[in-house]
Amino acid sequence: MIEKLRKYQEEIANIEYTCNLLSWELRINAPKKSQNDLVNLISYYDMKVFNLKTSDEYGQILYDAIESEEFSRLEEAEERYIKNLLRHYEQFRKVPETFYNEYSKMKNNANLVWRDAKENNDFNMFKPYLSKIIEMTKTYYTY
């Protein structure tokens, strides 16, 4: 069961790594013409991660892993890590999918505006995005 959890975690990590690379590309190198496509692609993969991290299958894998015989043979740090994954899973499931999708898109679009604001030395253009990100982050942590 622990191996199944490791494989599931690896899939999540691979998609998160892809998101990070795409986000870096968006901030550093992406031509203006491709920026909206990259924002949509990053949001798509963010939602894939969200769905993996909130799925019933993932929850069952976590519960089964903790109840397995293998779990009792793990190092203490590994046990804490898996229990922490379960705690995050239970918290993350409370976040509505539509909210998370909007939150993801907002952060990715804000990256575009931030890039332009830095280039033009006009940080007022980023202000509304920053306010919205702060507002949405506060909402996110109420779930």
Where are these regions (language model features)?
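A well-structured
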Residues: 1-143
